[in-house]
């Protein structure tokens, strides 16, 4: 069915607006040298390898380390053509902003088409401002950014009961990350429940078998240790049950917030079952940062719960009270989103102090400028995102790093980096080193 021009243009406008917000937040953090983790640098090194028609070598994980031995995310190669033309950390950050913005446009498209202009826009705004998306943008690039548009597209096809396209949009998830097979299998189970027995069974089989092959064959093949190093995160040194029962209040809050942003209406759609294995996997992992709502771990849940919301509002419900409540679902979701903005990552864009000059950023740029392009440098999380594009970068926490040309540390951001760069370099790498710069907590030493 053809859409009215306004119903076609509005989703695109919403996608562009939110994409601009995500890009602005990413770039502001980048130019202010606000480190979140080393992940953006890791993915840039991997994408750089693909961009030059080679393997995704990530020296930050170890000299010559193939990223496919860490996480199976070959889909990031799709960023490589853009990176080849615009080689920079900002290109990687913009890729994530664009991918999430596409998911916003997809959510808007199906919501407006199924629920009308006003309710559709309200749901889209709530989705675009959701905590899972904002936390992911704040955490810099991660491969799961590719899952956002794919899950939105598969979900939109589910709302339309377009079963073939549900399957087609689901399959690429296998190339996003090694554990996405469980989500593929969950979508297959939902299709099975919807009466699509053959398609459902195929997706379940592909998800389970494909995930097993990746975890036990592909990743061990590329990993120097011959295994999947994250296997020990489930239970860790404790039993899985002990971990599952740890901090129940925190985990319950994560669940409540995840479905609460839809006014709990998402629970009225079978599509919400996709969230169960994702949350379960996080809650039995012995890493406390998996249990909350920070970082990028809730990004994949956002298109799931909002598609479930749209599907729930689009369904015919037997109970009058549920029909009445579903009619107000968009308003409830928007109200929840408004309350959540008070301390949200995007809120910093409205604060004048965000744009004040950062003296340490000036010193950081000076330190980086003293490292010639193409030189090798051992560094910490505070500066690696800004160094990777033009230098061969190693992380100080990786064993067996070769002797670099420079060591550069950020000792002023509480990362625990060595205060005396010369003493560190001589102790770890030997030889003679000269202090080049010590300013505002940045220390740079050069090999002689």
Set out the residue ranges of the language-model regions.
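Start-transfer (signal-anchor) and selected internal transmembrane alpha helices
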Residues: 1-24
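Signature aromatic-anchored transmembrane alpha helix within multi-pass, membrane-resident enzymes
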Residues: 12-16, 205-209, 316-345
């Amino acid at each position: 069915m053809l859409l009215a021009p306004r119903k076609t243009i509005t989703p695109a406008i919403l996608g562009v607006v939110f994409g601009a917000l995500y890009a602005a937040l990413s770039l502001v953090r980048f130019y202010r040298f606000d480190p979140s983790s080393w992940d953006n640098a890791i993915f840039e090194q991997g994408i750089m390898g693909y961009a030059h028609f080679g393997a995704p070598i990530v020296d930050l994980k170890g000299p010559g380390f193939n990223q496919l031995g860490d996480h199976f995310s070959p889909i990031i190669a799709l960023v490589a053509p853009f990176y080849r033309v615009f080689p920079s950390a900002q290109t990687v950050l913009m890729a994530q902003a664009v991918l999430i913005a596409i998911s916003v446009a997809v959510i808007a498209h199906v919501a407006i088409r199924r629920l009308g202009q006003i309710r559709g826009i309200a749901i889209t705004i709530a989705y675009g401002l959701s905590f899972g998306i904002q936390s992911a943008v704040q955490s810099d690039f991660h491969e799961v950014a590719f899952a956002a548009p794919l899950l939105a597209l598969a979900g939109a096809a589910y709302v339309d009961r377009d079963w073939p396209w549900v399957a087609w949009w689901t399959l690429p998830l296998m190339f996003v990350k090694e554990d996405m097979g469980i989500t593929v299998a969950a979508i297959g189970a939902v299709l099975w429940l919807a009466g699509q027995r053959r398609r459902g069974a195929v997706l379940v089989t592909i998800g389970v078998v494909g995930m097993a092959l990746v975890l036990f064959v592909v990743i061990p093949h590329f990993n120097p240790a011959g295994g999947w190093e994250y296997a020990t995160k489930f239970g860790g040194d404790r039993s899985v049950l002990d971990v599952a029962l740890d901090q129940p209040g925190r985990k319950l809050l994560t669940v409540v917030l995840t479905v609460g942003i839809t006014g709990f209406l998402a629970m009225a759609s079978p599509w919400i079952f996709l969230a169960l294995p994702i949350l379960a996997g996080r809650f039995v992992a012995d890493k406390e940062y998996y249990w909350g709502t920070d970082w990028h771990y809730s990004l994949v849940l956002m298109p799931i719960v909002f598609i479930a919301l749209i599907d729930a509002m689009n369904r015919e419900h037997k109970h009058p009270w549920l029909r009445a409540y579903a009619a107000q679902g968009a308003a409830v979701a928007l109200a929840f989103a408004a309350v959540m903005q008070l301390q949200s990552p995007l809120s910093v864009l409205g604060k004048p102090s965000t744009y004040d000059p950062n003296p340490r950023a000036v010193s950081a740029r000076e330190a980086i400028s003293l490292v010639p392009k193409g030189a090798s440098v051992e560094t910490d999380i505070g500066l690696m995102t800004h160094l990777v594009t033009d230098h061969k970068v190693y992380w100080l926490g990786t064993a067996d790093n070769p002797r670099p040309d420079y060591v550069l540390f950020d000792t002023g951001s509480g990362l625990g980096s060595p205060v005396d760069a010369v003493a560190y370099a001589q102790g770890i790498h030997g030889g003679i080193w000269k202090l080049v710069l010590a300013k505002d907590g940045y220390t740079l030493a050069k090999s002689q």
